[in-house]
């Protein structure tokens, strides 16, 4: 019974953390690849994320030898370069 309570509390904690911190996505550039930040700073990623209409961003390392820009408060459609560009420039919508 105690194991079940511990598992339940851990599950609730994970849900609460995801609600507080929200989802984050890595944006795609015009070549359909992620923005790498191996030699860049968090400020570079923050600017990239603002271009994708996100609230902010930073450089994260999701795997060994890989550093990607990760955006907070970004819509899935805006994670793609041309999707965000079309929202900013309505004349591009052909």
Swiss-Prot record:
The record marks 44, 47 as: Important for blocking potassium channels. Has the structural arrangement of an alpha-helix connected to antiparallel beta-sheets by disulfide bonds (CS-alpha/beta). Residues 23-90 form the LCN-type CS-alpha/beta domain. GO terms for cellular component: extracellular region. It is found in: Secreted. The homodimer inhibits HMG-CoA reductase (HMGCR) (32% of inhibition produced by 0.6 uM), a glycoprotein involved in the control of cholesterol biosynthesis. The inhibitory effects of bumarsin are seen at much lower concentrations (0.6 uM) than that for statins such as atorvastatin (5 mM) and simvastatin (10 uM). In addition to inhibition of HMG-CoA reductase, this protein lowers cholesterol levels by inducing steroid hormone synthesis via StAR, and by increasing reverse cholesterol transport mediated by the induction of ABCA1 and APOA1. GO terms for molecular function: potassium channel regulator activity; sodium channel inhibitor activity; toxin activity. Belongs to the long (3 C-C) scorpion toxin superfamily. Disulfide bonds join 37-59, 45-69, 49-71. Pfam families: Toxin_3. Homodimer; disulfide-linked or monomer (edited version) or heterodimer of an alpha chain (AC Q6WJF5) and this beta chain (non-edited version). Keywords: Cholesterol biosynthesis, Cholesterol metabolism, Disulfide bond, G-protein coupled receptor impairing toxin, Ion channel impairing toxin, Lipid biosynthesis, Lipid metabolism, Neurotoxin, Potassium channel impairing toxin, Secreted, Signal, Steroid biosynthesis, Steroid metabolism, Sterol biosynthesis, Sterol metabolism, Toxin, Voltage-gated potassium channel impairing toxin, Voltage-gated sodium channel impairing toxin. Expressed by the venom gland. It comes from Olivierus martensii (Manchurian scorpion). Its main location: secreted. This is HMG-CoA reductase inhibitor bumarsin. GO terms for biological process: cholesterol biosynthetic process. Residues 1-22 form the signal peptide.
């Amino acid at each position: 019974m105690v194991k079940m309570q511990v598992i339940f509390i851990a599950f609730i904690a994970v849900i609460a953390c995801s609600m507080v911190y929200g989802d984050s996505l890595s944006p795609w550039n015009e070549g359909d690849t992620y923005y790498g930040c191996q030699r860049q700073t968090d400020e570079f990623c923050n600017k990239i994320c603002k271009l994708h209409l996100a609230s902010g961003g930073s450089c994260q390392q999701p795997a060994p030898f890989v550093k990607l820009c990760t955006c907070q408060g970004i819509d899935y459609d805006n994670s793609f370069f041309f999707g965000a560009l079309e929202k900013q420039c309505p004349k591009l919508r052909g």
